[in-house]
Amino acid sequence: MGKGDPKKPRGKMSSYAFFVQTCREEHKKKHSDASVNFSEFSNKCSERWKTMSAKEKGKFEDMAKADKTHYERQMKTYIPPKGETKKKFKDPNAPKRPPSAFFLFCSEYHPKIKGEHPGLSIGDVAKKLGEMWNNTAADDKQPGEKKAAKLKEKYEKDIAAYQAKGKPEAAKKGVVKAEKSKKKKEEEEDEEDEEDEEEEDEEDEEDDDDE
């Protein structure tokens, strides 16, 4: 896969991302020679962020707002290279894809695992949920699978109705276009008939002159 456009503006950063960046810079100043354990460092940042007051977080939120404004300004003048495919527009009103049985299972047990093991990373929580799902008996999975099947059925009906919304207009335009075409054809035929009648009249006049 080819790399993205190097001239494209860098994506905007969140307030938490600015906070982590500051933490990393502080850590480098204090322990310039020490190697960083990413998982441990990430957990420490997360815990510190949770204990911070709204006033303390405000500084980073202001930085994020300024970065967002800067990013949006740059994106207005950014011209993507030729051949780059644009992202497909997502309609916010379009029906959302239904969750799978496994996703419903994760939604139910995720808070429980986080409560029992608050220090676990996102990756470890996902791994644990996967193991739990694999060890769950088929009978115990059935309620979730039935619920997922119902949601899928509803989604298919909703998406069909959503996609059909634009069709009546298109069909209407098609009818109007056909009617215009028919009318034009009739007008052309009428003009041809008039021309034929004129030619016949001229011929009759010529015959009268000959007599």
From Swiss-Prot:
Gene3D superfamilies: High mobility group box domain. Signal peptide: none annotated. CDD domains: HMG-box_HMGB_rpt1, HMG-box_HMGB_rpt2. Residues 9-79, 95-163 bind DNA. SUPFAM superfamilies: HMG-box. It holds the Pfam family HMG_box_2. Disulfide bonds: none annotated. It is found in: Nucleus; Chromosome. Transmembrane segments: none annotated. Keywords: Acetylation, Chromosome, DNA-binding, Nucleus, Repeat. Coiled coil: none annotated. One of its GO terms (molecular function) is DNA binding, bending. One of its GO terms (cellular component) is chromosome. The modification N6-acetyllysine is found at residues 3, 7-8, 12, 28-30, 127-128, 172-173, 177, 180, 182-185. Residues 187-211 have a biased composition (Acidic residues). GO terms for biological process: regulation of transcription by RNA polymerase II. Binds preferentially single-stranded DNA and unwinds double-stranded DNA. PANTHER family: HIGH MOBILITY GROUP PROTEIN B1-LIKE 1-RELATED, HIGH MOBILITY GROUP PROTEIN DSP1. This is High mobility group protein B1-like 1. It comes from Homo sapiens. The lineage of its organism: Eukaryota, Metazoa, Chordata, Craniata, Vertebrata.
